[in-house]
Every structure is written in C-alpha cells, then in structure tokens.
C-alpha cells in the first residue's frame, strides 16, 4: 500500500494514451512529486497529501484551494478533488471551488472509504457525470462504507439510498 506500481515514464505514457483517446484520467497520487502525473484530468489527494505536495500544511478552505490551484498550474491538471475526511471533499479548478460536506452518520471504520470515494468519482466521471455530480456521488459512497465494519463493499441500493437521503436533506 502506498508504494505505487508505475515506474518512471509509465504513468506519463498511460496519461497520454488516455488523453489521446478522450478518456478522463483520475489519479490517486502517492509521494510528493506530482510531476509524474502531469496532464491527468484530476488528482485526488487527501488534505494531508495535498499539503505535502504543496510544501506546507493546509487546513482551511482557502489554504486547500490555494494549494490545489498551485498544483493545477504546475502540472496541467484540469481540477483537484481534495478528500477531507469528516469534512467531505473539495472540487477545485482555476475558476471555481466547491466544498461538499458529508452527511452526518455514525462511523464504524474508515478502512477503504477513500478508495471507495475515489473509485466512485472516477466511475461517475467516466460515465458522463460532471465533476460536482461525481463528487456528490463519491461523497455518498464513502459515507456508506464508513458506516460498516472493516473493508466493505457498496451496493447500488445503498448508494441510491444515500443519494436520496442527501438530496432530501439539502432540499
């Protein structure tokens, strides 16, 4: 875990192939050198990883937005999705920043929640959702799995229910 499997140049080649094919590239970055992911559609660091890549700790919304925009400019990402644990996630590009709160729920185990959120985000984006809709889906997906013990799978029914509840809570 956290070791990365792509040797130098492999990530860049895969990103180029996907971009040439018109496919979005979503990267769950590891390490501090995000140059290896240059040109990806989006990166999905957690708050701590974002701060490490930016060279400083980030806590507030403004600090997270500033750090994300620095990485966008430096590496050509279209946007950054910063996962923020109990604070949800932030979707940031050079013009806009959306902070998406989590829905209150009892947390049993955070194992796999970030991976679930990122996979749900990438799948939603690939299926044609815009980045904010994809983040809303990802946030709901992560919220379901933290309510389970151990690493857990997410069912369509659970995700649909979570989205329905979050939509009605916002209305």
Where are these regions (language model features)?
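Ribokinase/PfkB-type carbohydrate-kinase core domain
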Residues: 1-99, 103-106, 127-129, 137-140, ...
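Hydrophobic transmembrane alpha-helical segments of multi-pass transport and channel proteins
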Residues: 113, 145-146, 150
